[in-house]
Amino acid sequence: MGELPPNSVGVFLALLLCSCSLIELTRAQSPILEIYPKQEVQRKPVGKPLILTCRPTVPEPSLVADLQWKDNRNNTILPKPNGRNQPPMYTETLPGESLALMITSLSVEMGGKYYCTASYANTEILEKGVTIKTYVAITWTNAPENQYPTLGQDYVVMCEVKADPNPTIDWLRNGDPIRTTNDKYVVQTNGLLIRNVQESDEGIYTCRAAVIETGELLERTIRVEVFIQPEIISLPTNLEAVEGKPFAANCTARGKPVPEISWIRDATQLNVATADRFQVNPQTGLVTISSVSQDDYGTYTCLAKNRAGVVDQKTKLNVLVRPQIYELYNVTGARTKEIAITCRAKGRPAPAITFRRWGTQEEYTNGQQDDDPRIILEPNFDEERGESTGTLRISNAERSDDGLYQCIARNKGADAYKTGHITVEFAPDFSHMKELPPVFSWEQRKANLSCLAMGIPNATIEWHWNGRKIKDLYDTNLKIVGTGPRSDLIVHPVTRQYYSGYKCIATNIHGTAEHDMQLKEARVPDFVSEAKPSQLTATTMTFDIRGPSTELGLPILAYSVQYKEALNPDWSTAYNRSWSPDSPYIVEGLRPQTEYSFRFAARNQVGLGNWGVNQQQSTPRRSAPEEPKPLHNPVQHDKEEPVVVSPYSDHFELRWGVPADNGEPIDRYQIKYCPGVKISGTWTELENSCNTVEVMETTSFEMTQLVGNTYYRIELKAHNAIGYSSPASIIMKTTRGIDVIQVAERQVFSSAAIVGIAIGGVLLLLFVVDLLCCITVHMGVMATMCRKAKRSPSEIDDEAKLGSGQLVKEPPPSPLPLPPPVKLGGSPMSTPLDEKEPLRTPTGSIKQNSTIEFDGRFVHSRSGEIIGKNSAV
């Protein structure tokens, strides 16, 4: 073709532009249907809701009719019916003449071609299609966010994903990709395999899923914590509990998480936590039984359970049943025969049984006894039933085997005791009565002959006299009281024929025994064999008395003496004195330098015997007192001199008895005590260290300010008007005196110094108070003295003129008129050794009889006749 002219090209372009505008206008005016969203292919995830809107684009919307949707099977989709039921797919008219396709939950089956159709002006059919393509979004079907593998095992960290198209999976640990080049981690379709899980494998794992076609990416965070299977680390194989007592046992387990522990009784498969008396702590595994029963015996299983697994271990509970003696009978056997006593007990374990005599601690051993082969202990055990038997056999039994026996049942739980009695029967026996004295009677007094027969069983007793049974004599003077085992024969000896022998005969099933008894006539004692003076003083006389040479049955109850002055021939006026046989025979109240006559007799139950052993004895003249006797018990070691030990270190109380005054009353005592030492057994006094004191009217003296752990020789002398007695001497030792040393260290001042300081302090305080009163208020002793010192002479004269004109000073009241002290024997400190001259009577005085007596405390002077102390018979 040739080239067009330039104006032709412009015309062509104008024509082309007009044609396009015409075509566009034509299209705008033609009716169509539009579907929103406008994409012809809609990709939507399964399970999600979907809405598609069909809108007519026509010149006249009112000419549109039959607007509807058709599904992928070309079925008309109906509108939603009335009510709550909602179909999976329905249509709904929207404002603006639009029709919406509503899909509540998209499924794979709903994918396909959908059409929207309508008619326009009843002449033209309108249709618009849209394709719905479904896909499955990434969905975690099995991917828990917390997963717990077990230590030492292989574990798959689950991460199951559902998606369409299929996703790709990769793993991260603590934010870092996991390398699968080694055998530790293996990616599987259902998760991540971890081989031989260790605690170091714990952490945060990320399961990441991606769909390339859809560009979807989703992550799942999984926390992995390694669990450890339970392990029982402490449970004894055997447990022991005591019946009736509380019990506790531990089943200790470890694991992760902390395992829960339970106890199962194998016999019943019962969890003991639900049983009575049982308590279980599931955290610590402690099982407690408030009171163990014998039925609790058996095997128990300890279960330790956590999310990693279960482990169990068995143990046996042995119940120690305390022994119980359920049979022990008293037994009886005859002498010389065999006797066996059996004790039966139960317990777990079966108790050991032994015996012992009541009141002793020694137990019999199994088998024959070493110290007594007659006794054998036979034990027997039944462990299955928990029972034991012990038999104590005594062959050739003796009377000494009779008595109480204690059965002892013993096991680990405790001891049980029960007492039984073995009775050994024997024939009557009178051996205990062979040493009894005869029975005495006198003056027809009734006598009691008692017969006691020892025997088991009790014996019956008969009395015989002169070969005949007394019960057959019908003698009213013979009365039998009791027939056994004790029987008394009351004899009324109205004539001498009843003073004779009687026979007691005892009988039981094992034999007979006889015992002879004598009834004798008693008489008064015979003459006293001897009575001689052993000690003479001016006022006392001590005798040694030997009883009658022959004793006529009854014992001596007392010795009597009659004494009178020898010049007096009448015994009816004599003095009487009696002594018990075990007392000193001392006659007191005698006159010095006087001769006396004495006679003696013995007394028993019958009466006083005849007087005899007549003798005369003179008392010596007045003299110094007898030697006083200290009332202390000395202690003698080996051959050394006896020593009296003081319980104190710094003082000692000397006590003595009042000696005989020998005719003159004792007026004082002289005590001399000297410290000393023993050198080679010889007593040596310390020079210039002796103390001498004299005391009156007392029989004790306390020596003070002594030195601890020191020997003292003490001499005691009594004094009367004649002189001093011979000295009584003892050696005394004080204790160590630790307490005295402690007191000396602490005590700075003596008691007198402390009292003086206290009085001085009080006086000083009074002086200060008086001085203050004088200065402040012009009162007090000092103020009064000052006022008197300042008075003028005229004031003094005026004061003197008051009253009677002079001051009268009354004399003090005279003391009570007391008699002057009586001086006995001259100066109290004089020490006459003997009587130089007789006593002189002052001129003009009347001579009267007088007595001076000393009763141990006071001196009494009496005038008049001297009367003896004892009454005359």
From Swiss-Prot:
Signal peptide span: 1-28
The residue ranges for the Extracellular side of the membrane come to: 29-751
Q: Name one GO biological process term.
A: regulation of tube length, open tracheal system
Q: Say if the entry is tagged with keyword Endoplasmic reticulum.
A: no
Q: Which UniProt keywords apply?
A: Cell adhesion, Cell membrane, Developmental protein, Differentiation, Disulfide bond, Glycoprotein, GPI-anchor, Immunoglobulin domain, Lipoprotein, Membrane, Neurogenesis, Phosphoprotein, Repeat, Signal, Transmembrane, Transmembrane helix
Quote the biased-composition stretches of kind Polar residues, using this chain's numbering.
612-621
Question: Any stretches that span the bilayer, and where are they?
Answer: 752-769
Which residue spans belong to the Cytoplasmic compartment? 770-873
Q: Which residues form the Fibronectin type-III domain?
A: 524-622, 638-738
Q: Which GO terms describe its cellular component?
A: apical plasma membrane; axon; cell projection; cytoplasm; growth cone; leading edge membrane; muscle cell postsynaptic specialization; neuromuscular junction
Name the Gene3D superfamilies for this protein.
Answer: Immunoglobulins
Residues modified as Phosphoserine are: 827, 845
Does the entry annotate any disulfide bonds, and if so which pairs?
54-116, 159-207, 251-302, 343-407, 451-504
Tell me the CDD domains matching this sequence. Answer: FN3, Ig, IgI_4_MYLK-like
Cite a single GO MF annotation.
Answer: cell-cell adhesion mediator activity
Keyword Amino-acid biosynthesis among record annotations: no
Ig-like C2-type domain mapped to chain residues: 31-131, 138-223, 230-318, 323-423, 428-520
Residues modified by glycosylation: 74, 250, 330, 448, 458, 576
Q: Residues bearing Phosphothreonine?
A: 841
Chain residue ranges for the region called Disordered = 611-638, 804-847
Compositional bias (Basic and acidic residues): 623-638
List where Pro residues composition bias occurs.
810-822
Expressed, tissue-wise, as follows: In embryos, both isoforms are initially expressed on the surface of the axons in the MP1 pathway and later on several other longitudinal axon fascicles.
As for what it does, the entry says: Neuronal recognition molecule for the MP1 axon pathway, pathway recognition for axons during the development of nerve fascicles.
What is the protein name for this chain? Fasciclin-2
- What organism, scientifically named, is this protein from? Drosophila melanogaster
